Each structure stands twice: as structure tokens, then as C-alpha cells.
Amino acid sequence: MFVFTNLAPEHIESHGSFEQYLSDKKRIATLLSDSSKKRRVAIINGDDPYADEFTPKKVTEVVRYRLEEAKIYSSDQTGTSFQFDGATIFSPLRGEFNIRNMLAAAHFAKAFGIETPIIARAFSKLKTIRGRGEQVTLPENHPLRNKQQFEIVVDYAHTIESLEALYKTFQGHKKI
């Protein structure tokens, strides 16, 4: 099984150049083609410009997913609702980047025979990772909790792509 989510110019310093980084990452896809396993499944983010380059040639199945398949219903402070495999999925995670990752994970789970209701239940219980789109609020029992008229989001985004994705998720908010 191979899952390709995206490729962005990150960790270049470890590879020397973007071209070398691309080559090193493509080697991972090649490992699936060369595998002796009977079932070799590649799950590919079809929205990424490098999708074709990361689609292994000798596999038994290629699953391409796109953001448009998610049919996003809502995205607000409580989370995101979207469509997957005929079911409405809710997750407390926000942003298209998280939906893309959930689509990859959902297709991965389906490839292993996990049913959609189980996937939906798991996604509904997801929590943000500290420092990645993490919302900070006053504690539930704090007397001023209901008067808090601002939202604090902590994110350690450090590339242009990740900052743009974060700003798109929290549009209209002031940024510091």
C-alpha cells in the first residue's frame, strides 16, 4: 500500500535540491511497484500537480481521490462535515488540508475492508495535534468563557504552502 498526499518544497536542505527531493520521494512509489505482494494498492491525491509522477506503474489498483468528491457541507468553529462513500462525515478538524488527509485515510481504510460507518465514527473523535490548527479557549468552567469574543489558533506552519492553507481555513480572521 502506498499513499501519496502531496509534495511541497519542504526538507530541501536534507536533499540538496528540489529535484533530488522529488527523486528520493518517487523512490518510495517505486518500492510498491517492485513489491512481491499480490495486492499492490496506490492511493493518490489527484489534486496534486505531481500525482501522475507518483502513480506507480505496476500495481493492482490505483485509487485517485479529489477534494471535490468530499462535497463539503459545512466548515465552522465546531469542525467540518463532508461526503465520503455516500455517508456524511463530521470531524472536529478544520480546513481543506485536513479533509484531503481524511480522504486519503478513508480510502486507505476502505482498501483494508473497514466499513464507512466505522471510518465516520473514528473521524468524529479526531483531535487536533498540538500546534497544528490548535484552537485555544478559556476552560469550560471559567466565568468569562461565554464572553470570549475572539478565537486563538496556534499553528507551526512554516512553508508558504502550509501558511496559505492555514489562512484559507481561517479566512476573515486577524492574524498576528
What are these regions, as identified by a protein language model?
Residues 129, 160-176:
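Active-site beta-alpha connecting loops in nucleotide-dependent enzymes
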Residues 152-158:
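Switch II (G3) loop of P-loop NTPases
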Residues 1-151, 172-173:
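Acidic, Mg2+-coordinating active-site environments of NTP-dependent enzymes
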Residues 48-49, 158-162:
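Short beta->alpha connector loops
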